[in-house]
A protein has these predicted regions:
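Structured, charged N-terminal subsegments at the starts of enzyme catalytic cores
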Residues: 100-226
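Activation/maturation switch segments at domain boundaries
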Residues: 1-138, 227-231, 236-335
Length: 335
């Protein structure tokens, strides 16, 4: 291989990664649309519950929530239950009976704060379960697609470089675990369901709004607006996590297959509009043993869609190596 041929191969590799970035961006838009639909549906159900909670507390009795709760709490519960039962049985819907029923319902409402929380909790569980299922399906599709893409790229590289190989190495067992692999100490499922995960964080904020409403109905509009902001923030964070997981899968597949096929180096390819961190790495070539996500390889930050292409170091007839003219860097330079 001569320098001209090597440069042509590298140009094709670079262009292949930039084309892949466009494909990944379209894929991320599709998953974001699905996630948006799930969030919008759940947000509608939950805000409906909050609205109903407010109406049950405030509107039915025409009194302040403090006074309404006081009425319920000072009534003899046993005696009241009997009166309420008799009113329903006898259809005695006088103003007085209706007031009894309203206060009875209010008593159930004050004790139903936990029931409202349970309803919202169930909706959150359904929402995040659906997001997890959709994401895992998309990640598995991304894994298989990247395996196929890398297989084709490796074959092309070997043919163009004159490397004789019977087949492309495929570390099947290692690639199977890519989707559920840890990334900075946690996998996707743990980032959703752990004690400090997305589900627990959003649930905590929603319950806080319910608690606030139960003691201060005058703040209903404020709490409802706060609720909408919380949901939108949570949606953004979930989408960012999904984009990050997608690219993590791509990068891990690339690296595992590069190692299995004896590649010695890789070159960093920054996305268009890359941040200053990624721009500083663009075009840098590292030894394969220096590969470390977040230090010398993508992902350098959440939702990073930069990539790499790989190279096998060879020796020219004149004794020089194919890596001699590359911008070689060390992981230690970026720690």
């Amino acid at each position: 291989m001569n320098k001209t041929k090597l440069r042509a191969i590298q140009n094709r590799q670079y262009n292949a990664e930039r084309e892949a970035m466009d494909t990944w961006a379209k894929r991320d838009l599709n998953i974001e649309k699905l996630t948006e639909q799930v969030y919008q549906s759940s947000m509608q159900h939950i805000t409906d519950e909050v609205d109903a909670f407010y109406l049950r507390y405030a509107n039915r009795n025409g009194v302040s929530i403090k006074e309404a709760r006081k009425r319920a709490d000072t009534m003899d519960v046993t005696d009241y239950f009997q009166k309420a039962y008799e009113a329903v049985r006898d259809k005695d819907f006088s103003d007085e009976a209706e007031e009894w029923l309203r206060v009875y319902n209010l008593k159930m409402s004050t004790s139903r704060l936990e029931l409202e929380k349970a309803k919202i909790n169930l909706e959150l569980l359904k929402m995040y379960s659906e997001i997890e299922n959709i994401t895992n399906e998309q990640l598995e599709q991304a894994r298989l697609a990247e395996i196929a893409r890398q297989t084709d790229l490796i074959k092309e590289y070997e043919e163009q470089s004159g490397i004789l190989a019977n087949s492309v190495g495929n570390p099947t067992d290692r690639l199977k675990g890519v989707v559920n692999a840890d990334f900075y100490g946690a996998n996707f499922s743990e980032r959703i369901w752990s004690r400090n995960g997305h589900y627990a964080s959003l649930r905590k904020e929603l319950f806080k709004s319910l608690n606030n409403l139960s003691v201060d109905m005058m703040g209903y509009r404020r709490e409802r607006n706060r609720l909408m902001k919380i949901f939108n923030t949570s949606k953004y964070e979930s989408m960012r996590l999904i984009r990050t997981e997608h690219q993590r899968v791509n990068m891990q597949v690339q690296h595992e297959m590069a190692v299995a096929n004896d590649f010695t180096h890789y070159t960093y390819v920054a996305e268009s509009g890359a941040c200053s961190i990624c721009k500083a790495l663009a075009g840098k070539t590292f030894k394969i043993e220096d590969y470390e996500m977040g230090v010398s390889a993508p992902l350098m930050h959440p939702a990073c869609v930069c990539s790499v292409y790989h190279h096998i170091e060879m020796t020219y007839d004149n004794g020089k190596k194919t890596t001699d003219d590359m911008d070689i860097a060390s992981k230690d330079d970026y720690i």
